[in-house]
Amino acid sequence: MVDLSVLDLAYIGEGFTPADALANTLDLAQHVEAAGFTRFWLAEHHNLAGIASAATAVCIGHVAGGTKSIRVGAGGIMLPNHSPMVIAEQFGTLETFFPGRIDLGLGRAPGTDQQTLRALRRG
C-alpha cells in the first residue's frame, strides 16, 4: 500500500475566523487519519490574512493532541527565519508529547515579504 499524506494551510475562508480554520484543520486531520492516511503536514506562512498556520509548531501540537496515530509535521519550517535551537527545542518537545508521531520538514526560502522577514529575524 502507498503511504498517503495531506498538506494543509489552515485556510481561513471568507466569513470564518482563525479559530474556525484551526477547528477545520483538526477535523480534516481526524478524517484523513480514519481513512488510513499516514501523515498530516502543516505549512508555515506568515502575514497572510487567509492562513492560520503561522505558528506551525503550535498548530502541530493541536492536531497531534486531537488525533491518535497519524504522524503530524511541518512542511516545512523555513529555517533562515528562525533560530535553529528554538526549532530543535520546539520539535523535540512535541516529540516528547507525541512519541514517534512528529515530523520536521525544513526549507530555506524566505517564504514571505521583506517586512515580515525582517520582523521574523529580529528576534
Q: Which ranges hold each PLM region?
A:
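N-terminal beta1-alpha1-beta2 module of alpha/beta enzyme domains
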Residues: 1-72
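Flexible, glycine-rich active-site loops centered on histidine and acidic residues
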Residues: 2-18, 81-123
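Structural motif
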Residues: 43, 75, 105-107
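Generic structural signal for well-ordered secondary structure
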Residues: 52-56, 80, 87
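Active-site nucleophile and cofactor-binding loops and adjacent substrate-binding regions
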Residues: 74-82
